[in-house]
Amino acid sequence: MAATKPAFNPPGKKGDIIFSVLVKLAALIVLLMLGGIIVSLIISSWPSIQKFGLAFLWTKEWDAPNDIYGALVPIYGTLVTSFIALLIAVPVSFGIALFLTELAPGWLKRPLGIAIELLAAIPSIVYGMWGLFIFAPLFAVYFQEPVGNIMSNIPIVGALFSGPAFGIGILAAGVILAIMIIPYIAAVMRDVFEQTPVMMKESAYGIGCTTWEVIWRIVLPFTKNGVIGGIMLGLGRALGETMAVTFIIGNTYQLDSASLYMPGNSITSALANEFAEAESGLHVAALMELGLILFVITFIVLAASKFMIMRLAKNEGAR
């Protein structure tokens, strides 16, 4: 019997080779872009690195007319506002995610979830304008003044809430950042909580566990990696936020007090305010070094989150 021809020709290896080359090229482009950013930041900031050295990191003074620059105030403002934002946003986001996945009635889950996603879509400049013209005056009258009167006489803690109630400042910027990152963290937490197998939760309820026990002993252990990822996503958003912080932080290079009520500055705000007006080469180099510092901070945060997730996975496997 004569051999019949196949209905179609089998695919050759040429397509696989082309696909493999394209995928590798895409990965290489990502690495080249990352390396290019790092190299360009180092080259552009080199005059500042040569002149100020490591002292740039802990010098408070920023005097553009005299070409004296220090990054301590922007670094302090960036880290403190981000910490305040996380301190507020994480528990609120945790509560929102748990309510949506465990407690909310069916008719409320979808509209509330859409509302959270819409909050994440609001441009940061809108948050900044709202924070400056609406939030800051109310914050000064209804929070800063009464809390300052109560807390200012308490040793150590009182120093954080002392001084005049401007409305704007480091604390106000941290609160605005918290409002901005809550939708991101809450959305990620909600999605990872929904990945918990229903059978595990129903089995826990079946043996008499309360809702809190199910959340604490079933949902959280199963989703802890995703929860950490959501928190780090929010932290990265807070570290890199520019416009909203620029509106509300005060934009001053002063660090004479530990009070959170005082105006300050952040790395992103300094770059946004001064880059277009920088004239001298050293001024531009100092601003580029601020960008390099922000890049390093972001890299450290990412590396720490990856290390934490790896440790959690290792400990889970050892049980």
Swiss-Prot record:
This protein's UniProt keywords: Cell inner membrane, Cell membrane, Membrane, Phosphate transport, Transmembrane, Transmembrane helix, Transport
Entry superkingdom: Bacteria
Pfam families per the UniProt record, alphabetical: BPD_transp_1
CDD domains in the record: TM_PBP2
Any GO MF annotation of the entry: phosphate transmembrane transporter activity
SUPFAM superfamilies given in the database record: MetI-like
Segments on the Cytoplasmic face: 1-24, 95-117, 188-232, 304-319
Major localization listed first in the record, in broad terms: membrane
Residue ranges of the TM segments: 25-44, 75-94, 118-137, 168-187, 233-252, 284-303
Subcellular location as annotated: Cell inner membrane
Gene Ontology annotations for the cellular component aspect, listed alphabetically: ATP-binding cassette (ABC) transporter complex, substrate-binding subunit-containing; membrane; plasma membrane
Membrane topology, record value: Multi-pass membrane protein
Gene Ontology BP term (one): response to radiation
Periplasmic side: 45-74, 138-167, 253-283
PANTHER family according to UniProt: PHOSPHATE TRANSPORT SYSTEM PERMEASE PROTEIN PST (PTHR30425), PHOSPHATE TRANSPORT SYSTEM PERMEASE PROTEIN PSTC (PTHR30425:SF1)
General function of this protein: Part of the binding-protein-dependent transport system for phosphate; probably responsible for the translocation of the substrate across the membrane.
This protein's name: Phosphate transport system permease protein PstC
Naturally occurring in which organism (per UniProt): Escherichia coli (strain K12)
